[in-house]
Amino acid sequence: MSAGRNPHSGSYTQEVFGPVASFYVVDSEDEAITLANATPFGLGGSVFTADIERGRSVARRIESGMVFVNHSTFTAPELPFGGIKNSGYGRELSELGFGEFVNR
């Protein structure tokens, strides 16, 4: 876990693979979403909240290939996996993943 990081630090501006959780203090939900979307990457993320509907609303506003509510990111064969922005090369797994490899 990493707290009090600057959004301009390497751990924020570079894609980190590993069991890393960074925490940033913000004053509003909108500021949190702006901060989450300010990265050039978008593989996956999570929203943790006691209000599930609010969490889903926030998750829809985050620019990431996969956003989970009250769960860390994970993969399952029936779910499409992949990022957006500078993360990944499209989708894999599920029917959407097969579509990445065929001509239509």
Label each residue range with its predicted role:
Residues M1-R104:
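Conserved C-terminal structural/oligomerization subdomain of aldehyde/semialdehyde dehydrogenase
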